[in-house]
């Protein structure tokens, strides 16, 4: 279930927050209008820090969440596909 869209806090934003039971995904959506490779570099270090900060703020106000991850969704409008990368910032 989508619990928030464009959630903002502490000068940071998460595109989507999706929750299923006690698990949460913080989703960064990247849209591409033409064909070509989708790069992991589309989310740079500064943006990663902002997304992480927003996720931490949200989690601070929602105790009881046992699992959380950041997911990147690459939407390619040229061929109507979506590619998901879970645990995007783990490394």
Predicted features by range, described:
Residues 1-9:
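A short acidic/basic microdomain associated with nuclease active sites
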Residues 7, 29-31, 87:
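Active-site donor-binding loop signature of nucleotide-sugar glycosyltransferases
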Residues 10-12, 78-79:
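Short acidic/glycine-enriched loop/turn segments that link adjacent beta-strands
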Residues 12, 23-25, 71, 83:
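Protein kinase-like catalytic core scaffold
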Residues 14-37, 51:
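Conserved catalytic cores of phosphodiester-cleaving nucleases, focusing on short active-site segments
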Residues 32-57, 61:
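Mg2+/Mn2+-dependent nuclease catalytic core
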Residues 61-91:
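Domain-level recognition of nuclease-like catalytic cores that cleave nucleotide substrates
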């Amino acid at each position: 279930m989508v619990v928030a869209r464009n959630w903002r806090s502490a000068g940071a934003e998460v595109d989507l927050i999706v929750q299923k039971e006690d698990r949460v995904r913080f989703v960064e959506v990247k849209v591409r209008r033409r064909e070509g490779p989708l790069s992991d570099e589309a989310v740079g270090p500064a943006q990663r820090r902002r997304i992480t900060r927003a996720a931490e703020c949200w989690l601070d106000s929602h105790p009881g969440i046992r699992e959380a991850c950041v997911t990147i969704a690459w939407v390619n409008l040229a061929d109507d596909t979506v590619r998901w990368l879970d645990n995007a910032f783990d490394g």
